Amino acid sequence: MSDKFHILLLNGPNLNLLGTREPEKYGYTTLTEIVSQLEAQAQGMDVVLSHLQSNAEHVLIDRIHQARGNTDFILINPAAFTHTSVALRDALLGVQIPFIEIHLSNVHAREPFRHHSYLSDIAVGVICGLGADGYNFALQAAVNRLSKSN
């Protein structure tokens, strides 16, 4: 790897609908806008940011597997897979890449089934309830952590 940090941003199911899907919960910012802002932030930090959004669990898992050996950190909004996917958990454990779990809404203030995450206990940290800003905070936290370890 080069001297730049390589960070992978993963977004799970239905996040492609951001901006129009339940904006009272998720806001009016689109995923394209979030990613564009993060790319600009990453460029200013000399970070290589890759992004994938998928509604398919296996596509996210395959991308996590591909990250092994060439990615320093993962930022993931697993969306509904948060509450259901042991497979995503196993993939993240398998590649041993540190990650931060991101949620736009405060999952703890929502329906009880959204309170459990299969990922949070193995994550470096969890950011929830801060809307699109949560992505910016996660990127900054990842870079801070990577900088301290180098």
Swiss-Prot record:
Q: Which GO terms describe its molecular function?
A: 3-dehydroquinate dehydratase activity
Family of this protein: Belongs to the type-II 3-dehydroquinase family.
Tell me, what does this protein do in biology?
Catalyzes a trans-dehydration via an enolate intermediate.
Q: What class of enzyme is it?
A: lyase
Native source organism of the sequence: Yersinia enterocolitica serotype O:8 / biotype 1B (strain NCTC 13174 / 8081)
Gene Ontology biological-process entries: amino acid biosynthetic process; aromatic amino acid family biosynthetic process; chorismate biosynthetic process; quinate catabolic process
Question: What does the record note on quaternary structure?
Answer: Homododecamer.
Which SUPFAM superfamilies does UniProt cross-reference here?
Type II 3-dehydroquinate dehydratase
Q: In which pathway does it act?
A: Metabolic intermediate biosynthesis; chorismate biosynthesis; chorismate from D-erythrose 4-phosphate and phosphoenolpyruvate: step 3/7
What protein is this chain from?
Answer: 3-dehydroquinate dehydratase
Q: Which UniProt keywords apply?
A: Amino-acid biosynthesis, Aromatic amino acid biosynthesis, Lyase
Residue sites binding substrate per the record = N77, H83, D90, L104, S105, R114
Catalytic center at which residues? Y26 (proton acceptor), H103 (proton donor)
Site Transition state stabilizer: list residues. Answer: R21
